[in-house]
């Protein structure tokens, strides 16, 4: 939350009001300097000096991106400046005919208008009509553009992860798909199913049935030995292009698989996985994109009735110790670390037209990061990740 001009230039309201204030102040100080000091109200010098201090304070607060923390203080300070400028205007107009005094009065009128705008904005509730109108230009218009350096970059990184790993986890005869329902809440941009294994055809019900009993020659659970009691493990990779050598495979065709009570059920080892499956086992690498899977600790065997080719979900009914949670970023390997905690000052309902926004309630504690703009990347306690408006939350000391 350090000083950065990007925080100031990224807010059109800040640029317009501070720039207008500086120009108005220059007009006022020029008129005061050119006036005859015998007829110029001496107290107006203090009002003009006080005004430039207020303008500089507001600029610094915007540049440090903590303007929301001092809004109530600014209302009091700007109200004092409003009294000074309006009083100076009255004295300069009616008590003197000096051109310099009239020029200073014009500058004070402009400063009075600016101070009134600041009082209405800083003193108004974020959901008030005036604030909503002003924020429609700054927060909605400019704030979402900052996602290019924050949340949208995160989406782009996830897209790259999808491309590099091919995001495939075939469940049947080599062609599997993963639908929108299998993605984390932050990845709703995928509106249509994605062909995972690179094929062009979706698996048929017959291929899924054959795959579940390991009778497809090119499927991941194919039985190439002719022994119905032995299911060959996968020889390809789920997410990458490198094949893995099975470590728990029994190549003796006279032996049977002992990892499952069902002899017709294939098995796979952790060496065949790339992290997209999010097993709870610590031996499985977590370099995927954080897909939520219904998997168990003891996942060496798969139930032959639990293959769902439409969604890519895997169930294991032999073990009830399941993990059905949205994984943290440290587990998914996305590289995102939420370094700060923030408390919601108000309740917020996400815009239904923006899939990146998240809703939250007043006093809710959020984990936030990328706090350099009007919109911060945030994660709720339930694991939902998205963006939230910075003026609705307050950073907490940790």
From Swiss-Prot:
Any one GO biological process: filamentous growth
Keywords from the named record: Cell membrane, Membrane, SH3 domain, Stress response, Transmembrane, Transmembrane helix
Domain of life, source organism: Eukaryota
Polar residues: bias regions: 220-235, 266-286
Annotated TM spans: 13-33, 43-63, 66-86, 102-122
Domain SH3: 337-398
Assigned GO CC terms: plasma membrane
Residue spans of biased composition, Low complexity class: 156-167, 242-265, 297-326
Membrane topology according to the record: Multi-pass membrane protein
Protein location: Cell membrane
Region span, Disordered: 145-167, 213-327
Topology, Cytoplasmic side: 1-12, 64-65, 123-398
Regions of this protein lying in the Extracellular compartment: 34-42, 87-101
Cross-referenced Pfam families: SH3_9
Summary of subunit composition and partner proteins: Forms homooligomers.
Job of this protein: Plasma membrane osmosensor that activates the high osmolarity glycerol (HOG) MAPK signaling pathway in response to high osmolarity.
Family: Belongs to the SHO1 family.
Protein name: High osmolarity signaling protein SHO1
